[in-house]
Amino acid sequence: CSSDLTDTTVYDYDILHTRMREEAFLNAGLRIHTIDQRAGREQHDDMCYAGGIREFVTWLNRAKNPIHDGVIYMAGQKGDSIAELAFQYTDSYSESILSFANNVHTPEGGMHETGFKQALTSTLNAYGRRMNLLKDGDEIKGEDYREGLTCIISVKLTDAQFEGQTKAKLGNSEVRTLVSAIVSEKLEEFLEENPAVGRAILDKALTASRAREAARKARESIRRKTALGGAAMPDKLRDCNEVNPELTELYIVEGDSAGGSA
């Protein structure tokens, strides 16, 4: 809402509707009505999602192309702490992770996101090696496994410890352990039962890894050419593409014409 330094408070229906929709997604089966009865702005919405955060992921991916059917869902509890996760891969090149603690959005992430990312990378790496989907020379990083990922993480705990006044980041270290354990166990079970999905995820991560490596080499090549392309360097002295010093030689010549075409 906004008052703009006046005595009249103006509510933005779209902002309220978006927040209420999040609440409906995060609390499966909860029905929320939003109604605007202001003259000329009449509208209402009725929201109830039996699938909870699974439907949240489907809604977020409504304009994207998933690379596998269905949303991967997992949940677990330790003591008074509860965590549930839902995610799906698409053919996009960006990642979208939305995390919540006690229904409060944590845009800067925190321990729940850290636990998820660590477990996702280690579990997929182990699965890829075990199923011979990864070779010895393949180096896949966490960012490669998260390319095209849409994920919702929701945790509920009695003593949430937020960092900063805006509650943008969750600091409970025990939540990292809980989420990591859930993902490690449940994702491994899912991959064993759904090998086609596992292969699709690994194939996408491998493609992302190779693209990242190609981009890195291209940047290094441009930097080398830029460093050696100054006015002080003669045109005949070209950059060397070989990075192994055992396979290269250095020729030192004197004068502008002494080297010829060397």
Show where each model-derived region lies:
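GHKL-family ATPase ATP-binding module
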Residues: C1-A262
